């Protein structure tokens, strides 16, 4: 998920006078941080909540040695079987920890991205759009995002798996910390970064590229944010699926798969994960769940961008209105 802030001025296409102040993309300096964090938190929570059942399916489809009862051919077929055999709420298992992590993680993510992108764009292209600035800003923002989100990812994916032994969120956190130590919550952090840094770099560059073509004046146009976000999510999800498979293995520590690969103890490290995945399924194993991953990411990033841009626009316009009223009522 992600975003954009260029200093290109665009007045609203309404029957009101053209204003000379910055449009919503440029965000007034006094309000930008709070606006970005609020909009980012809301966008992140909605993104993960709306598409969570598909994310649960993706986690199961990436299992290297799935239970015969948990082998699925399609996302729809998987959801139908899970609901029929495990209950209506089963696809939502682990959603609570995801929401707890997504709010602060995305608040930091969007705020960091906007600040770094603006600073780098000023240096590289005098405030104009720069793909280098977009990629670097997205990568740096990812480091902060994943530091907050990684423990939530570990708990979430363990609760999503078929026949998960954990009764609740608290039970999962307690059992993992007792048996594997607190380090277990960050065992996949380096792999997460290895996956998410290229993911976000591709994601932001694709989004900005699409915006340049569909929304060159950087106005608030919801349809362009949805289209650009969906395209960015699909491309970045597809090219990073092999790394996501490795991350899932490190997060879940899938016992059957590790036993088949003769791995004793706990699997750690990207190199070991790559070797294990290849040993168990060859090259095709690196693309397990790619359909579910793309289906999940396309609407997720479209939701994240459209919600983020809406709240950024709404909050900025509200603050501008408050300032205008305050200025008019203040004594001269």
Swiss-Prot record:
It is found in: Mitochondrion inner membrane. Changing residue 61 to K: In frs-tm130; induces embryonic hypochronic anemia. Solcar repeats lie at residues 31-119, 129-213, 220-314. Keywords: Ion transport, Iron, Iron transport, Membrane, Mitochondrion, Mitochondrion inner membrane, Repeat, Transmembrane, Transmembrane helix, Transport. GO terms for biological process: embryonic hemopoiesis; erythrocyte development; erythrocyte maturation; iron import into the mitochondrion. It is a multi-pass membrane protein. Changing residue 207 to D: In frs-tg221; induces embryonic hypochronic anemia. Disruption phenotype: Morpholino knockdown results in embryos which are profoundly anemic. PROSITE patterns: SOLCAR (PS50920). The chain crosses the membrane at residues 33-52, 94-113, 131-150, 188-207, 222-241, 289-308. Belongs to the mitochondrial carrier (TC 2.A.29) family. Mitochondrial iron transporter that specifically mediates iron uptake in developing erythroid cells, thereby playing an essential role in heme biosynthesis. This is Mitoferrin-1. It comes from Danio rerio (Zebrafish). The gene is slc25a37.
């Amino acid at each position: 998920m992600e975003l954009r802030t260029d200093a290109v001025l665009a007045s609203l296409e309404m029957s009101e006078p053209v204003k000379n102040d910055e449009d919503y993309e440029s965000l007034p300096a006094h309000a930008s941080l709070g606006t970005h964090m609020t909009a980012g938190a809301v966008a992140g929570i909605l993104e993960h909540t709306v598409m969570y059942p598909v994310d649960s399916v993706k986690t199961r489809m990436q299992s290297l040695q799935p239970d015969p009862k948990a082998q699925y051919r399609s996302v729809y077929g998987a959801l139908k079987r899970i609901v029929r055999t495990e209950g209506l709420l089963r696809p939502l298992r682990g959603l609570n920890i995801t929401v707890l992590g997504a709010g602060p993680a995305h608040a930091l993510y969007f705020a960091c991205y906007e600040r770094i992108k603006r600073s780098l764009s000023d240096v590289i292209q005098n405030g104009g759009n720069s793909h280098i600035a977009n990629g670097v800003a997205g990568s740096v923002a990812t480091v902060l995002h994943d530091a907050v989100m990684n423990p939530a990812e570990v708990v979430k994916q363990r609760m999503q798996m078929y026949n998960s032994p954990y009764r609740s969120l608290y039970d999962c956190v307690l059992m993992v910390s007792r048996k594997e130590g607190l380090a277990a919550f960050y065992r996949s952090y380096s792999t997460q970064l290895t996956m998410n840094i290229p993911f976000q770099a591709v994601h932001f560059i694709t989004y900005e590229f699409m915006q340049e073509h569909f929304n060159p004046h950087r106005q608030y146009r919801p349809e362009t944010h949805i289209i650009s976000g969906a395209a960015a999510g699909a491309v970045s999800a597809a090219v990073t699926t092999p790394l996501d498979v490795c991350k899932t293995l490190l997060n879940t520590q899938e016992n059957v798969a590790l036993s088949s690969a003769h791995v004793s103890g706990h699997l750690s490290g990207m190199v070991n994960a790559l070797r294990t995945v290849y040993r168990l399924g060859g090259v095709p194993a690196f693309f397990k769940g790619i359909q579910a991953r793309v289906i999940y990411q396309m609407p997720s990033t479209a939701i994240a961008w459209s919600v983020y841009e809406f709240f950024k626009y709404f909050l900025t316009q509200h603050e501008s209105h408050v300032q205008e009223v305050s200025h008019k009522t203040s004594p001269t």
